[in-house]
């Protein structure tokens, strides 16, 4: 990968020496951070061969190739050192923005030392493109270019989803369908990028700003990183093309200025996306706590009622089943073993029930030791089999606690099955299922009774 990334950088040199885009160092740093197992002799040797091979096959001299490779290695491994050092020193925090600090410090200092090493070594080599009298302009050109490359490439490596996550997303039948409004920020960005080529000038750097803010507030980090890279590369190409034609005498200082502007634009967009994701995550956590029972992590009664009312009215549902279950002699369990064991029994029951339900089935703690399940589009036989399976699983899977004998318990279950559309309100249906549960208790407990 390093070899092909180097070739890409070599083939994008607008002048005789500095590449327009050099992704290799950011790629290698990202891989070493994301996959620590690559920090082995074989991994480092492979990267070294990739750097050397790419320059040699493009007719660079051996000595110059070695000098460039060492400069790149200094940038990557000093950046890796500062990343590990900063992450170890920073206190743990729930703020996702603070997790960016090691990356920002690693890129800034790693690129600094890589550029410093390059200007101290390369001008002294034969056939060098660097001159001693231009050390500092070359230093800032190298440094700014490397940081911009990192802003473009590094987030793609670090935020890329794992293959298991990709497969889960593909196999998930309940993924929200992409709607036109989801693509509006991207379309706005395409329009703003096109404007940088049509109405180009120094202000072109700001054309995509509003669309980038919109995208940062709308998309996940990896998707935003892809968009951010596209915008930065496009702006870099269009704006530098303008100054190549018009400001040849101060090309390098102008390029440095453009790069700094793009670095700030790209980094600010990424930080905004992280802040937005952090806010959305906190909102989801608060919403989850508001809709679920804190002990069993099942739906609470209010949330269950709202979702069940929607299920009753949904046009695609042709039947509904309610399963009401209650732990037998739960008060005796609490009196004999204590409330801690009672709480663990409730958690044990909820875990067993969840393992026997589909993802979209509704499962609620109705109060105390009583639970209720709503199934949609099941026939009566399927519902009875599910209820009986749950009863048997609970009966034959006792609660295991440390330093304690297994504690077994049973449940009584009442089942109601209806065809839709139906007129009775939800509470009337729950009462019928509860009456069936009462009959199960009355007939000796640990059984399933169908509502009449």
Q: Which residue ranges define each predicted feature?
A:
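Catalytic-core segments of nucleotide cyclases and related cyclic-nucleotide turnover enzymes
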Residues: 335, 339, 380, 384-391, ...
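Short helix-perturbing small/polar motifs within transmembrane alpha-helices
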Residues: 1-20, 28-127, 154-166, 176-204, ...
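A short pre-motif secondary-structure segment
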Residues: 362-365
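Short aromatic-rich membrane-water interface segments that cap or initiate transmembrane helices
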Residues: 136-145, 255
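Short helix/loop segment flanking the catalytic signature motif in cyclic-nucleotide metabolism enzymes
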Residues: 345, 358, 372-393
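Heptad-repeat coiled-coil signal-transmission/dimerization helices
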Residues: 304, 308, 346, 350-353, ...
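Conserved nucleotide-binding and Mg2+-coordinating catalytic segments in signaling enzymes
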Residues: 287-309, 325-339, 347
């Amino acid at each position: 990968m390093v070899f092909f990334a180097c070739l890409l950088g070599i083939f994008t040199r607008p002048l005789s020496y500095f590449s327009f885009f050099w992704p290799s160092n950011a790629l290698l740093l990202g891989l070493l951070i994301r996959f620590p197992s690559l920090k082995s002799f074989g991994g480092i040797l492979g990267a070294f061969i990739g750097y050397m091979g790419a320059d040699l096959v493009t007719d660079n001299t051996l000595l110059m190739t070695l000098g460039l490779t060492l400069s790149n290695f200094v940038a990557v491994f000093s950046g890796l050192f500062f990343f590990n050092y900063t992450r170890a020193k920073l206190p743990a925090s729930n703020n996702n923005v603070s997790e960016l600090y090691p990356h920002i410090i690693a890129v800034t200092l790693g690129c600094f030392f890589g550029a410093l090493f390059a200007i101290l070594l390369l001008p002294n080599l034969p056939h060098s493109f660097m001159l001693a009298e231009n050390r500092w302009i070359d230093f800032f050109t190298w440094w700014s270019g490397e940081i911009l490359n990192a802003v473009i490439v590094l987030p793609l490596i670090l935020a890329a989803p794992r293959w298991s996550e990709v497969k889960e997303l593909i196999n998930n039948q309940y993924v929200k369908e992409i709607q036109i409004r989801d693509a509006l920020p991207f379309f706005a960005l395409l329009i703003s990028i096109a404007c940088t080529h049509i109405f180009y000038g120094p202000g072109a750097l700001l054309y995509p700003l509003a669309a980038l803010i919109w995208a940062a507030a709308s998309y996940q980090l990896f998707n935003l990183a892809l968009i951010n890279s596209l915008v930065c590369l496009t702006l870099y190409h269009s704006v530098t093309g303008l100054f190549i034609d018009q400001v040849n005498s101060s090309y390098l200082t102008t390029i440095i200025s453009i790069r700094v502007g793009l670095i700030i634009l790209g980094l600010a967009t990424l930080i905004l996306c992280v802040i937005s994701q952090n806010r959305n995550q906190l909102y989801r956590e608060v919403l989850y706590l508001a809709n679920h029972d804190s002990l069993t992590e099942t739906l609470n009664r209010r949330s269950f009622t709202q979702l069940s009312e929607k299920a009753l009215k949904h046009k695609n549902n042709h039947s509904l089943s309610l399963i009401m279950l209650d732990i037998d002699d739960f008060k005796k369990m609490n009196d004999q073993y204590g409330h801690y064991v009672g709480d663990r029994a409730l958690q044990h029951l909820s875990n067993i029930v969840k393992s026997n339900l589909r993802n979209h089935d509704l499962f609620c703690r109705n109060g105390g030791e009583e639970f209720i399940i709503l199934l949609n589009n099941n026939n009566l036989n399927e519902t009875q089999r599910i209820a009986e399976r749950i009863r048997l699983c609970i009966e034959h899977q006792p609660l295991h606690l440390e330093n304690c004998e297994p504690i077994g318990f049973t449940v009584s279950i009442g089942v109601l099955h209806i065809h839709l559309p139906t007129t009775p309100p939800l509470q009337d249906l729950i009462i019928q299922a509860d009456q069936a549960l009462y009959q199960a208790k009355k007939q000796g407990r640990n059984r399933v009774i169908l509502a009449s």
